[in-house]
Every structure is written in structure tokens, then in C-alpha cells.
């Protein structure tokens, strides 16, 4: 079952990306290094509700 998730920047808190994930394969929260346009650099983005 795929669900929509939002990825938020850990430094500024902006929710910059929307993605989907398979909850059966990845029950934990996803953390990815993505580009934050507000800070103009790559930062860690964490899954939010």
C-alpha cells in the first residue's frame, strides 16, 4: 500500500517535497538529502505526517 508523504527540511522546517512510499517495505520514517531552496543548499529532509 503506497501512501503520500511530505518531506520537510530539518534546518528551516519548510515542507519542500511530496513523495510516496510503500509502508510495508519502509515502516520507519524516511530521511533523504535534498535541496532546500530557502537555504540554497542540500540539507537533510525528514518525512512528516
Swiss-Prot record:
**UniProt GO MF annotations:** structural constituent of ribosome
Question: Which interval of the chain is the signal sequence?
Answer: none
The record's annotation in SUPFAM superfamilies points to: Zn-binding ribosomal proteins
**Record GO cellular component, one term:** cytoplasm
Q: Which GO terms describe its biological process?
A: translation
Q: Which NCBIfam families match?
A: PRK00504.1, PRK00595.1, rpmG_bact
The protein's name = Large ribosomal subunit protein bL33B
Which species does the entry assign this protein to?
A: Staphylococcus saprophyticus subsp. saprophyticus (strain ATCC 15305 / DSM 20229 / NCIMB 8711 / NCTC 7292 / S-41)
Amino acid at each position: 500500500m503506497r501512501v503520500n508523504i511530505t518531506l520537510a527540511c530539518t534546518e528551516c522546517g519548510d515542507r519542500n517535497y511530496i513523495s510516496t512510499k510503500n509502508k510495508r517495505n519502509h515502516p520507519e520514517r524516511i530521511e533523504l538529502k535534498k535541496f532546500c531552496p530557502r537555504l540554497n543548499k542540500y540539507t537533510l529532509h525528514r518525512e512528516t505526517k
